[in-house]
Amino acid sequence: HMFHFSDAFIKEYLPQTIELGRSFVTLEYQSTRAGSKGLFALDNLWDGLGALTVVMPNVKYFFGKVTMYPSYHRRGRDMILYFLKKHFNDREELVTPMEPLILETSDEELRTLFCKDTFKEDYKILNTEIRKLGYNIPPLVNAYMSLSPTMRMFGTAINYEFGDVEETGILIAVDEILEDKRIRHIQTFIESHPDALKMPCESEGVFTPKVVTPQEGCCH
């Protein structure tokens, strides 16, 4: 009820897509309570998604939403969303928010700020400016940006039924996940669970992604 799905998305993408639902790390594994073991909680979530691509090789895309809270600094939020749109914008308009979030910072100011030609240069600006505000770039935003250089960003809408959080739609092509992430979260599962390749699925085949090297400056 927040996003409009185009016919092209419904026909060409959705049948081969898994939605990334909300995840919650239980208290005993949160870093503030668990110390070092909590640092691996987010990695465990990625490991689970990597396993899905092995046992369900027909899945080609992950669709989900990045959530930001109303308490986050407004100018910082605007900078992050502008940056995402500049470097990951969905030009085909496969998915669009029904009521797009309107940024409070002027487009001219943001365009002047993020004036570089590469992801790496603009990312340095973003990270510096966010820190000046006393904040950090949300971990999941960094995580998604470092997962694939071809991620698509579909715009942002407010979820009035879930605490007015601001949700940004994204799409990641499984076979375009960066090589180091593929090895870390997918190849390791294949090596430790060889029998998983024999599990039944809707289509035959084993996930064999092409190697995708980082675009210049994709953050890690």
Indicate where each model-derived feature is located.
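Acyl-donor binding region in acyl/amide transferases
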Residues: 1-151, 155
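Short, solvent-exposed polar/charged micro-motifs at secondary-structure junctions
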Residues: 73-75, 163-168
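Non-catalytic substrate-recognition and accessory regions of acyl/acetyltransferase enzymes
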Residues: 1-23, 148, 152, 166-220
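Short proline/glycine-enriched turn/loop segments at secondary-structure junctions
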Residues: 155-162
